[in-house]
Amino acid sequence: MHEAVDQRLVDIQDEVRGAFGWALDEDRVAAKALVQSASECVKAVPSWSEDGRRDTLDTLRIELSSAERVTVLGAAATEQEALRVSQQEGLIIAADGSVGALQVRSRLACVVSDFDGGAHLHSAAEEGVPIVAHGHGDNIQRSALALSEWSQFDTPPPLVLTHQTPTSCHGAHNFGGFTDGDRAVCFALAMGVDPQ
């Protein structure tokens, strides 16, 4: 599924992959593996079914598109920057480990992550914060391990699955962008957030 607001946001993935010499096939395998990992946990977490993930996406779309303001907290955000953002009106989308800089998470809509946010991502997942979880060629094992662990939480996080291939992957979306921060902005735009 492609839901990028502009095809160029998906095309950049091919450009970056090509510049680094990374194989597209690895990203395809990762996308399918991510969907499979979520499916294997459906017994423990029914909301991780395809319908459940679609409901999570619909809920996030409604929340984000109706928010007066949405701020993306970039991966390198400091605690001071996070404090300033958390004092503003509106919702916050955190890029991966930047969620650790947020002292108060009451306005945190979701975390966009490729599973390398460490303890901060784990903590947000344990709190039941929705995760826009991304599969790519070098995080297959890390994503499977994280989903397996998260499925055991008292309140597993709602999931939206994403990938970075130019073709569709049943059960996952491609909103565009390459880094967690890029993908957070692309996700916000795809959810109908006004870029102003």
Where are these regions (language model features)?
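Short, glycine/acidic-enriched capping/hinge loops at junctions between secondary-structure elements
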Residues: 74, 81-86, 103-105
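Extracellular/luminal Protease-associated
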Residues: 70-74, 86-93
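Short active-site-proximal "capping" loops at secondary-structure junctions
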Residues: 77-78, 99
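N-terminal donor/sugar-recognition subdomains of glycan-related enzymes
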Residues: 1-70, 78-84
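Acidic/Gly/His-enriched mid-domain segments of enzyme catalytic cores or analogous surface patches
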Residues: 90-91, 97-193
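Glycine-rich anion-binding loop/nest that anchors nucleotide
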Residues: 72-77, 177-180, 195-196
